[in-house]
Amino acid sequence: QMYGEGLYPGYYEYKYPKAGQKNSKVSVHSYSVVTKDTKEMKVPVEGDFYIPRITFTQNPDQLAIMTLNRQQNVFNMYYANPKSGVFRLILREENKCYVDSDWLTSIQFLNNGFTYVSEQDGYSHIYLYSPTGVMQRQVTQGNWDVTAFLGVDENTKTFYYESAEESPIRRSIYKIDAKGVKTKLSTEEGMNKAVFSDNFAYFVNTYSNANTPAKITVNETKTKKELRVLQDNAA
């Protein structure tokens, strides 16, 4: 591979396992900046499994380690203690077709559980799990896909997401509360993408359709009111 930002390009060689070749063996280790000790988290990563994501939960003594097999239809998530190395399986999903690894970055660890987006019912939907990995409820459901999970307000137990429930060629922004009451937040028909403030009181929305170039606005969540236009590409 040739790359570089300098006057002359450099050459870098790395292993890329092609079909039929063995995957590299991987392992997870924690390092103490105080004692300078290294400890291996001996989670099962055998055969054709690899580690697509490692992240801390809201508990500083709890590391989430995620594994996928090469076929990407068996997903495991372990909770491991970086001090002791003790781990336990917290979530496992087997799909006869495919587990979308892109959704793993959308897992949110809450004070009392975590969220997980899965296609286990045939469509991409948001699920809420307990701290021990027991599914508490399916947050969204229907014959349509959640296309982006935008966050959850733990104070109000409200979930925010983007979906294609109106049409496969449109994207809209919604919120849904603990009782399952759903509210559409985007007001324009077409493609909407939103980024919410930390307290979910406001969101920046990027909207476009076949006849409208991208328009970026700041909106108030409660009233859906457009507060300010950040960018308008209209002629």
What are these regions (language model features)?
Residues 59-61, 111-112, 155-157, 201:
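Short coil/turn segments that connect the beta-strands within blades of beta-propeller domains
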Residues 89, 99, 106-118, 128:
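Large, well-folded core regions of big proteins
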Residues 26-33, 78-85, 128-131, 174-177, ...:
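Beta-propeller blade signature
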Residues 1, 25-27, 41, 50-55, ...:
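Non-catalytic accessory segments flanking enzyme active sites
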Residues 33-43:
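A short helix->beta-strand "capping" segment at the edge of beta-propeller domains
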Residues 20-24, 70-74, 119-124, 165-170, ...:
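Short, solvent-exposed loop/turn segments at conserved positions within beta-propeller repeat blades
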